[in-house]
């Protein structure tokens, strides 16, 4: 105890010294986050904001460097290095760095030679040598040790991203693990070692493959290329070219790391439950002697020439047609232009009352049109994006967008939109500040752009100062009718995509039972445990009746003045597949008192919004916004549902758009895979039951659709309230605005069952692409048993739990088979539901056989590791200690437990049981619940590129049509 006291006292003295010795500190009066910003002597920025809603801290480490800083001959480097930052250092990720280093040096040398070879046979032979040395190096390496470290301390959301301007590393950690986090991050950033290079290269290439099937990504790359002839925003992409990705340079990567990964180019951003003084002391202790780079190169580029005539480009692909227009703007460092641009884009399109919203979307002139400003530090973009109706040309959509943009310069908009826009921005910021991730992201954005916090945190004041004249002048200067780029995304084959075969890779050693002394030191470090706080439904929320047949779930919002009212009805697509079309129709209609445009404009003025949602088993009507205005907003929505005036012209146009949307969905790889997954899990009867046939859709009348919505109000339902009013006030307010029948008909919940899989079979759906999507599913009919929950959750954590799980290690790290892969034992969502097991992977077509074989191997013969198990268990327990249910999330959690027949959540019992479980329990789950299953394998891909004879070895193969899986 005495030693603990001494250590604490020393820590506080160090913290105080850190505060007083810091010569560059910043606080801003009136900052709603009460932020503290410090610059250490080595240039490292530390941004902090305290939020004690849960005992966790969102951390971002932001590097002011991204794709724009890539060498021209090795584009994609910044993003690739982001991946390599997860491979460890000299202290972790290896069992013997001294023995490993000569092999890593040889791999580096071989890759430098490899990238100069053009002869295919010589390249193949060189890659065999690289693979051989890499395998030897893998015997010493300890893959995924970083992820083990983060899992061990209870981190969530371990990840990173790279854009043109930034590379950001994210962890959400328990509050008591800040020092361990700092120790690991300091070592990782200061002493990175590049290992696991060739298998990670395959993962990066799979990510590139996925981007090549995204026509939206290709469209935006073309926009940037048109706008920026000199700046890297337009001359190179974050993911790089296919050719350069296959010819990487470890030398260039190391040079990049040494140049940009330095303290005077990095910010640590923290938001959560912590003591800023202690946090700063830790940062200074572990990062303070990190040497800066006084010679960080400034990005050099020639200023862009003015665009004097529209630049037109075409891109091709299988997805639905669209057209985008973009104008070049000053970068986000120009605070005035950025503020006016944000307001101007909201006047043009805000989802409710903007010019495009009312003049284009509400009038059904196109399928859909959007506008937004895309801010970047060096140059920003003002963008419109439009999808054509059936029979409409992209040029016609372009002209409609130009007409709306021209209204900004002409001042052809109501000045009241400016005040409404600022109020809605204030509401959006209020919501942002509820969440640690959003709070810390505000720091990241300011740091990357080089905007002082005193300016960044006053952005709403700048928005409020924008006048109509400012918007007009902005549009006249930047949004002229001749200085834009237009990209037409047309249907057709993209001939620029190169088909590259996957190299032969020897699976590297995973060394699960090895651990570094560094990891052991972190594991042995004692921290004061955070006491768990499990939900108590009798105290944490209030459940009662609003009226006969109408239940109320209430939770008070103590954070801000936002209120949300949600009406939930146990009727969804299973009971009536036309319900979602009825909700879609309603949004175009008005009442005898207000037109549709007036409703949208009034809701925007109130800083409120409403939404309708229809899933398999329920329909939701939600109203949310500033608490004082929610009663009026709820009244408007209720009057609309009960008194909507039909319009047959609108309905006819809606039907045409729905048919077009169906055709477009069949062109989307993601939509096709979603449909195939539903078909695999639920079967053809489910598809038929939840999908209107074309004939049924055509025959729908206004009276049918609006009648379905009015009927909902005659049914029993549940009302969720989360807001600042007391329960008594909320009850009175809702009762006054909400229509409730005298004797509402009760509606029982009905759920979509999953199909049992007594024998294995293969379902193949066609989609022409360089990669396949794969989903295997098994249901043996086992019913929900709450006694199994703790063991199943621990199995899922060990086997499929993120980057530390067996799946990630085997499928991505060891074999380079995919960018993403997952597998888990699915627990039922209602008490009579059944367990299922699924596995998912996406990869290039020539990796199909290896992917399926290796998945089946690890599923049926699960690798066993006491070390990996201990880390999985420790991480799961740590996350449960810091798990908190707040706001609407608590009400949803209560409803989920109720569906499972639970009066109280299982969390406490699961937490207690987990502490006594061993690897033997996980092995027992695998043996009893997972091994030896029969599956339905669903594969979306090009049959001409798939190994069909191999698939027939898995079971009978049935080739489906897109009509089969979509139901139309």
Where in the sequence are the language-model features?
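Bacterial N-terminal signal peptides that target proteins for export
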Residues: 1-9
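Bacterial N-terminal signal peptides
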Residues: 9-17
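Bacterial Sec-dependent signal peptides at the C-terminal "C-region" and cleavage site
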Residues: 16-31
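Mature N-terminal segment immediately following signal peptide/propeptide cleavage
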Residues: 28-62, 540-559
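Charge-rich, well-structured scaffold segments of protease-associated domains
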Residues: 39-42, 97-297, 363-524, 601-747, ...
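Solvent-exposed coil/turn segments that connect beta secondary-structure elements
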Residues: 51-53, 62-66, 89-90, 174-176, ...
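Active/ligand-binding-proximal structured segments within catalytic/core domains
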Residues: 52-101, 325, 335-348, 549, ...
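His/Glu-based metal-binding/catalytic segments typifying zinc-dependent metallopeptidases
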Residues: 206-212, 225, 295-353, 385, ...
């Amino acid at each position: 105890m005495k030693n603990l006291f001494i250590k604490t006292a020393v820590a506080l003295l160090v913290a105080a010294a850190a505060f007083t010795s810091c010569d560059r500190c910043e606080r801003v009066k009136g900052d709603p986050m009460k932020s503290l910003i410090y610059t250490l002597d080595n240039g490292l920025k530390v941004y902090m904001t305290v939020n004690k809603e849960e005992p966790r801290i969102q951390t971002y480490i932001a590097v002011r460097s991204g794709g724009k800083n890539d060498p021209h001959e090795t584009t994609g480097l910044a993003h690739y290095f982001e991946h390599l930052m997860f491979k460890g250092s000299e202290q972790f990720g290896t069992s013997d760095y001294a023995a490993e280093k000569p092999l890593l040096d040889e791999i580096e040398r071989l890759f430098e030679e490899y990238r100069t070879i053009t002869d295919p046979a010589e390249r193949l032979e060189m890659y065999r040598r690289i693979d051989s040395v890499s395998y030897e190096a893998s015997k010493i390496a300890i893959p995924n040790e970083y992820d083990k470290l983060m899992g061990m301390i209870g981190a969530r959301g371990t990840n990173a991203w790279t854009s043109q301007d930034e590379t950001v590393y994210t962890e959400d950690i328990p509050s008591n693990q800040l020092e361990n986090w700092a120790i690991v991050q300091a070592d990782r950033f200061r002493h990175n070692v590049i290992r696991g290079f060739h298998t990670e290269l395959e993962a990066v290439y799979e990510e590139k493959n996925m981007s090549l099937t995204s026509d939206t990504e290709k469209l935006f790359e073309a926009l940037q290329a048109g706008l920026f002839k000199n700046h890297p925003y337009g001359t190179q992409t974050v993911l790089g070219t296919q050719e350069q990705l296959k010819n990487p340079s470890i030398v260039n990567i190391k040079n990049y790391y040494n140049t940009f990964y330095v303290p005077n180019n990095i910010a640590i951003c923290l938001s959560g439950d912590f003591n800023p003084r202690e946090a700063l002391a830790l940062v200074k202790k572990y990062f303070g002697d990190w040497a800066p780079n006084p010679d960080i190169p400034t990005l050099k580029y020639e200023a862009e020439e003015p665009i004097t005539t529209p630049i037109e480009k075409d891109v091709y692909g299988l997805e639905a047609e669209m057209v985008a227009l973009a104008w070049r703007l000053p970068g986000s460092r120009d605070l005035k232009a950025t503020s006016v641009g944000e307001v101007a884009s909201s006047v043009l399109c805000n989802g409710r009352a903007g010019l495009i919203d009312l003049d284009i979307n509400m009038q059904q002139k196109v399928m859909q049109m959007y506008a937004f400003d895309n801010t970047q530090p060096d140059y920003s973009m003002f963008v419109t994006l439009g999808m054509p109706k059936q029979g409409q040309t992209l040029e016609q959509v372009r002209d409609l967008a130009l007409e709306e943009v021209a209204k900004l310069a002409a001042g052809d908009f109501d000045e009241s939109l400016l005040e409404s826009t600022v109020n809605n921005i204030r509401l959006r910021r209020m919501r942002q500040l509820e969440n640690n991730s959003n709070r810390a992201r505000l720091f990241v954005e300011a740091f990357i752009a080089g905007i002082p916090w005193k300016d960044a945190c006053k952005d709403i004041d700048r928005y409020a100062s924008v006048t109509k004249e400012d918007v007009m002048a902005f549009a006249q200067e930047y949004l002229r009718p001749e200085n834009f780029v237009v990209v037409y995304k047309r249907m057709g084959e993209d001939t620029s995509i190169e088909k590259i075969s996957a190299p032969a890779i020897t699976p590297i050693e995973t060394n699960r039972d090895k651990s570094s002394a560094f990891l052991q030191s972190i594991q042995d470090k004692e921290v004061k445990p955070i006491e768990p706080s499990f939900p108590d439904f009798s105290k944490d929320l209030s459940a009662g009746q609003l009226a006969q047949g109408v239940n109320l779930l209430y939770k008070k919002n103590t954070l801000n003045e936002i209120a949300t009212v949600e009406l939930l009805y146990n009727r969804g697509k299973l009971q009536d597949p036309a319900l979602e079309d009825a909700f879609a129709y309603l949004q175009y209609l008005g009442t005898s008192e207000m037109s549709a445009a007036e409703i949208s404009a009034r809701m925007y003025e109130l800083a409120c919004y409403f939404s309708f949602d229809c899933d398999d088993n329920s329909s939701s009507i939600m109203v949310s916004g500033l608490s004082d205005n929610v009663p009026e907003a709820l009244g408007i929505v209720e009057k609309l549902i009960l008194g909507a005036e039909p319009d047959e012209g609108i309905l006819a146009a809606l039907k045409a758009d729905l048919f077009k949307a169906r055709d477009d969905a069949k062109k989307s790889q993601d939509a096709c895979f979603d449909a195939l997954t539903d078909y695999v899990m639920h079967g053809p009867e489910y598809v038929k039951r939840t999908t209107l046939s074309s004939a049924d859709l055509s025959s729908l009348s206004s009276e049918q659709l609006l009648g379905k919505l009015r009927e909902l109000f005659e049914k029993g339902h549940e009302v969720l309230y989360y807001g600042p009013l007391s329960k008594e006030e909320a009850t009175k307010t809702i009762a006054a605005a909400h229509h409730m029948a005298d004797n509402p008909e009760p509606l029982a919940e009905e759920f979509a069952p999953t199909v049992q899989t007594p024998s294995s079979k293969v379902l193949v759906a066609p989609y022409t692409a360089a990669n396949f999507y794969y989903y295997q599913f098994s249901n043996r009919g086992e019913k929900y048993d709450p006694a199994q929950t703790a063991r199943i959750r621990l199995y899922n954590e060990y086997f499929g739990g993120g980057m530390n799980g067996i799946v990630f290690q085997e499928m991505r790290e060891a074999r380079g088979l995919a960018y993403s892969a997952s597998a888990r034992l699915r627990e039922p969502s209602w008490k009579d539901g059944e367990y299922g097991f699924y596995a998912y992977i996406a990869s290039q077509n020539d990796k199909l056989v290896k992917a399926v074989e290796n998945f089946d191997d690890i599923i049926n013969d699960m690798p066993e590791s006491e070390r990996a198990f201990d880390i999985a268990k420790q991480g799961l327990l740590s996350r449960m200690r810091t798990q908190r249910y707040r706001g609407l999330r608590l009400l949803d959690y209560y409803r989920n437990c109720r569906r499972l027949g639970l009066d109280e959540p299982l969390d406490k019992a699961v937490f207690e049981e987990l502490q006594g479980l061993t690897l033997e329990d996980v092995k027992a789950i695998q043996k009893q619940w997972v091994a030896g299953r029969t599956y339905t394998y669903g594969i979306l891909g090009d049959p001409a590129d798939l190994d069909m004879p191999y698939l027939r070895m898995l079971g009978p193969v049935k080739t489906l049509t897109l009509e089969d899986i979509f139901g139309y």
